[in-house]
Regions:
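Helix-turn-helix
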Residues: 18, 22-60, 64
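Hydrophobic alpha-helical connector segments
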Residues: 64, 68, 77-107, 157-161
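N-terminal intrinsically disordered/low-complexity leader segments
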Residues: 1-14
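Helix-loop "lid/cap" segments that line or gate small-molecule binding pockets
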Residues: 80, 97-102, 110-120, 143-146
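Amphipathic alpha-helical packing segments from all-alpha helical-bundle domains
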Residues: 74, 89-93, 104-108, 122-147, ...
Length: 200
């Protein structure tokens, strides 16, 4: 499967890009409440005022992270649509995005992390997180409908599929093995294929 640019590793040369890359990795491993600007400052050897210049608040940084993640997922979904024949395989390849995320150092979905922290998030960040999941539901529902899932079931089926992928990432982290047979990526792909077969 194609390797998609989701995780922001060395994605740009500007200071803002480097800050976003660092923050994304921190969120995906520690959670929104598990990092501070001091962590980014130490990793990138830049001052905290420099970070505040680009992202005045942690909430502003989080919104920028989610906006970039939404855009990258949109590009990846289009590539799945363009590269893959048939709805079943498109759903399996879409799950590969989640497996790829985990393969990058045991990370989990950026917006899945934000969802876990939802009660402590600023309202704007919660809304941005909701918008990300709305994008995913819309696409998955469209593929399921194309596969012939009845309209009365499409919404619930899309929710179930997304919930399974997000949960599979947590199980993969519990396994603690990004690579190798039986490791995290295999867990994610197995969950996806099993659920796709059940839904279609």
């Amino acid at each position: 499967m194609t390797a998609y640019q989701l995780e922001g590793r060395n994605s740009g040369v500007t200071t803002a890009d480097r800050i976003l890359d660092s923050a994304q990795a921190l969120v995906q491993v520690r959670g929104y409440n598990g990092f501070s600007y001091a962590d980014i400052s130490a990793e990138l050897s830049i001052t905290k005022p420099s970070i505040h210049h680009h992202f005045p608040t942690k909430a502003a940084l989080a919104e920028a992270l989610i906006a970039r993640y939404r855009e990258r997922f949109a590009v990846a979904r289009k590539e799945v649509d363009d590269d893959t024949a048939g709805p079943r395989q498109r759903l399996v390849d879409y799950a590969g995005l989640y497996a790829q995320t985990f393969a990058d150092g045991g990370r989990i979905c950026l917006c899945g992390v934000f969802a876990v922290d939802a009660e402590s998030l600023p309202v704007a960040v919660r809304h941005a997180t909701d918008a990300f999941f709305a994008d995913q539901r819309r696409w998955v529902a469209g593929v399921l409908a194309e596969a012939g899932v009845p309209a009365s079931r499409v919404g619930a089926a899309a929710e179930a599929y997304l919930a399974a992928l997000e949960g599979a990432l947590l199980l993969a982290r519990a396994h603690g093995q990004p690579d190798g047979a039986g490791g995290g990526r295999d867990v994610i792909r197995s969950v996806a294929e099993t659920l796709v077969d059940a839904l279609l």
